[in-house]
Amino acid sequence: MTIHQFLLLFLFWVCLPHFCSPEIMFRRTPVPQQRILSSRVPRSDGKILHRQKRGWMWNQFFLLEEYTGSDYQYVGKLHSDQDKGDGSLKYILSGDGAGTLFIIDEKTGDIHATRRIDREEKAFYTLRAQAINRRTLRPVEPESEFVIKIHDINDNEPTFPEEIYTASVPEMSVVGTSVVQVTATDADDPSYGNSARVIYSILQGQPYFSVEPETGIIRTALPNMNRENREQYQVVIQAKDMGGQMGGLSGTTTVNITLTDVNDNPPRFPQNTIHLRVLESSPVGTAIGSVKATDADTGKNAEVEYRIIDGDGTDMFDIVTEKDTQEGIITVKKPLDYESRRLYTLKVEAENTHVDPRFYYLGPFKDTTIVKISIEDVDEPPVFSRSSYLFEVHEDIEVGTIIGTVMARDPDSISSPIRFSLDRHTDLDRIFNIHSGNGSLYTSKPLDRELSQWHNLTVIAAEINNPKETTRVAVFVRILDVNDNAPQFAVFYDTFVCENARPGQLIQTISAVDKDDPLGGQKFFFSLAAVNPNFTVQDNEDNTARILTRKNGFNRHEISTYLLPVVISDNDYPIQSSTGTLTIRVCACDSQGNMQSCSAEALLLPAGLSTGALIAILLCIIILLVIVVLFAALKRQRKKEPLILSKEDIRDNIVSYNDEGGGEEDTQAFDIGTLRNPAAIEEKKLRRDIIPETLFIPRRTPTAPDNTDVRDFINERLKEHDLDPTAPPYDSLATYAYEGNDSIAESLSSLESGTTEGDQNYDYLREWGPRFNKLAEMYGGGESDKDS
């Protein structure tokens, strides 16, 4: 609540006691007061009982809202006509806000409000009152209902549902055109005074707009407001209660008004004359430039349609309106030729597509401009006299025959000689060739229609002065047919004749094919090369013929196969013919003529044995052979003697060492089994680098028993070899034929050694890493022992 509202409320309460008294404020309603009524009821003993109706005595209560006093606000008083004033009655209040918002004095019946009440939250309260006897606690009056009405004060200002409104109105509108209506609401009681009567006024936005005081309708106040000059307006509207009088509360809102566009501006070209250039080689449909007329309007009101209305280039050029950019795109309509014409003039018009009749007086809504188009010369490629060529030639022409000529010219003002060539990608077999000077196309190989009926060639014409300028043209060569192929059998015929055949029996129907394609279609004739006593040919005159028997019965044991030469000829010029040989087998047939066996096949198959049975027999024979081979292979395997007798025996086991050396191709593996079987030792080969003085026969030791321990056996053999005089010396110089880098370590051999063991220093062994520590300790320890 504002300070202004609070002062008004305070003045109202100060003046209130002078104008009204409690009796006036809490005046009894027009409802008649309940009176005490009596009625007589006869008793059974003849006495008459009197029953009295008692009634409440109270006023209808009114309470002023927004009370700001420090004490409880007095509402009114409840009183019963049974109350004698001795305090014997007790008043009880129930209903809306009883005990919280409203309290009652139990003895006097006075009702008070405990806090400030807002009528806008609740306009009236319904309560119930009851009076009981304090001693008996029985009601002396029936419970009755009453209403406390809240009197309104002007404590609410008018409010708008929206803080900011958005509205629009067409530009160029007449005065008084409705824009938008704003409505404010006042929460005060409209039936009590002028607290809720709202009047509208405009605080900002004059002189362009006005508002109706009673309705809040905003209207235009100036005529012909132009959007192109100003588009946005901000209007502030005030709503004030108390009928707009002094002391009324008010609220404001903002209305943003936009002037919408109307078509009140025609299109205008920025230039009277526009110059464009285009190459004469530009293909049809090429965009050569654009024109654009400006329109101050927006949206559909600025849409423009372009057209060519006059000029000498109306047949050569066209214009298309681009909807997105509102430009007129000028395109090539027909092929251009610099040598024919070098300059064209067009008159282009731009016109609005949507015109508002209300603004015809501002028209016309169109404009024109002149477009001059200059054609620029380019070095054009040669031009053929036709877009394509078709030549027809018979397939039997001689090599080198001219089949046709192509012609081309240079369209430039300064013409250049033309050179012709064939695109070899279209003539991979090089069947054709072309004269480079005059364009004559001729054959370089024989033609064959049966291999290819059409040849699609590409001829290239290029300027001699500028070989990059080339043109291609398609040349179609159709090969015409010549009767150069003889007819042949259509398929291979497997023909048989039954032994019991009779004369005139049909055994085969034959047909023929020809690779040629005569104009009148194929027509073949069939006949025998010579008279045959066994068979004859009957021509059906439909490019087929029937093979018939001429005698009664055939014997396959005497003659199993007959060869019948048949002559097939065509009717084209020159006539072509060929002889096809028909192989006829003699077969045994049943009474129905169905073949049972023929020629050699009958001799191989026994009587009554079918082909399926023969296949089954062959499969059984193959299976038996496989079983025999497998059994023989198993029998040939011999059981080898095991070398390892127990898990502890490590003989012939693989032991892996981290040694480097030659592979299997460079080294010869030692067979430890030879320790147990000395007879398996290979003969010792003499070394080439040592010449022995005496040759000794190697000693042979007996074979060790199988149960001999390996260690004892090796020690025994080692002792024998130590005592063997034929064994080579331990220190001997061996020369190997391979190349390699020298070792940084000196030779450990005593041969060819320039120092003795005592003079050799082995300290460098310690520098070789941890793997050689043991070796360094062995040699280092020897020196220390010797010194000690």
Swiss-Prot record:
<feature type="glycosylation site" description="N-linked (GlcNAc...) asparagine">
    <location>
        <position position="456"/>
    </location>
</feature>
<dbReference type="GO" id="GO:0007043">
    <property type="term" value="P:cell-cell junction assembly"/>
</dbReference>
<dbReference type="GO" id="GO:0098982">
    <property type="term" value="C:GABA-ergic synapse"/>
</dbReference>
<keyword id="KW-0106">Calcium</keyword>
<dbReference type="GO" id="GO:0016477">
    <property type="term" value="P:cell migration"/>
</dbReference>
<feature type="glycosylation site" description="N-linked (GlcNAc...) asparagine">
    <location>
        <position position="438"/>
    </location>
</feature>
<dbReference type="GO" id="GO:0005509">
    <property type="term" value="F:calcium ion binding"/>
</dbReference>
<feature type="modified residue" description="Phosphoserine">
    <location>
        <position position="784"/>
    </location>
</feature>
<dbReference type="InterPro" id="IPR020894">
    <property type="entry name" value="Cadherin_CS"/>
</dbReference>
<keyword id="KW-1003">Cell membrane</keyword>
<dbReference type="InterPro" id="IPR027397">
    <property type="entry name" value="Catenin-bd_sf"/>
</dbReference>
<feature type="topological domain" description="Cytoplasmic">
    <location>
        <begin position="635"/>
        <end position="788"/>
    </location>
</feature>
<protein>
    <recommendedName>
        <fullName>Cadherin-10</fullName>
    </recommendedName>
</protein>
<feature type="glycosylation site" description="N-linked (GlcNAc...) asparagine">
    <location>
        <position position="534"/>
    </location>
</feature>
<keyword id="KW-0677">Repeat</keyword>
<keyword id="KW-0165">Cleavage on pair of basic residues</keyword>
<feature type="domain" description="Cadherin 2">
    <location>
        <begin position="161"/>
        <end position="269"/>
    </location>
</feature>
<keyword id="KW-0479">Metal-binding</keyword>
<dbReference type="Pfam" id="PF01049">
    <property type="entry name" value="CADH_Y-type_LIR"/>
</dbReference>
<dbReference type="GO" id="GO:0016342">
    <property type="term" value="C:catenin complex"/>
</dbReference>
<dbReference type="GO" id="GO:0044331">
    <property type="term" value="P:cell-cell adhesion mediated by cadherin"/>
</dbReference>
<dbReference type="GO" id="GO:0000902">
    <property type="term" value="P:cell morphogenesis"/>
</dbReference>
<feature type="domain" description="Cadherin 5">
    <location>
        <begin position="488"/>
        <end position="606"/>
    </location>
</feature>
<comment type="function">
    <text>Cadherins are calcium-dependent cell adhesion proteins. They preferentially interact with themselves in a homophilic manner in connecting cells; cadherins may thus contribute to the sorting of heterogeneous cell types.</text>
</comment>
<keyword id="KW-0812">Transmembrane</keyword>
<keyword id="KW-0130">Cell adhesion</keyword>
<keyword id="KW-0732">Signal</keyword>
<feature type="topological domain" description="Extracellular">
    <location>
        <begin position="55"/>
        <end position="613"/>
    </location>
</feature>
<feature type="glycosylation site" description="N-linked (GlcNAc...) asparagine">
    <location>
        <position position="256"/>
    </location>
</feature>
<dbReference type="Pfam" id="PF00028">
    <property type="entry name" value="Cadherin"/>
</dbReference>
<dbReference type="GO" id="GO:0016339">
    <property type="term" value="P:calcium-dependent cell-cell adhesion via plasma membrane cell adhesion molecules"/>
</dbReference>
<dbReference type="GO" id="GO:0048787">
    <property type="term" value="C:presynaptic active zone membrane"/>
</dbReference>
<dbReference type="GO" id="GO:0045296">
    <property type="term" value="F:cadherin binding"/>
</dbReference>
<feature type="domain" description="Cadherin 3">
    <location>
        <begin position="270"/>
        <end position="384"/>
    </location>
</feature>
<keyword id="KW-0325">Glycoprotein</keyword>
<keyword id="KW-0597">Phosphoprotein</keyword>
<dbReference type="GO" id="GO:0098609">
    <property type="term" value="P:cell-cell adhesion"/>
</dbReference>
<dbReference type="GO" id="GO:0098978">
    <property type="term" value="C:glutamatergic synapse"/>
</dbReference>
<feature type="modified residue" description="Phosphoserine">
    <location>
        <position position="788"/>
    </location>
</feature>
<dbReference type="GO" id="GO:0099634">
    <property type="term" value="C:postsynaptic specialization membrane"/>
</dbReference>
<feature type="propeptide">
    <location>
        <begin position="23"/>
        <end position="54"/>
    </location>
</feature>
<dbReference type="GO" id="GO:0005886">
    <property type="term" value="C:plasma membrane"/>
</dbReference>
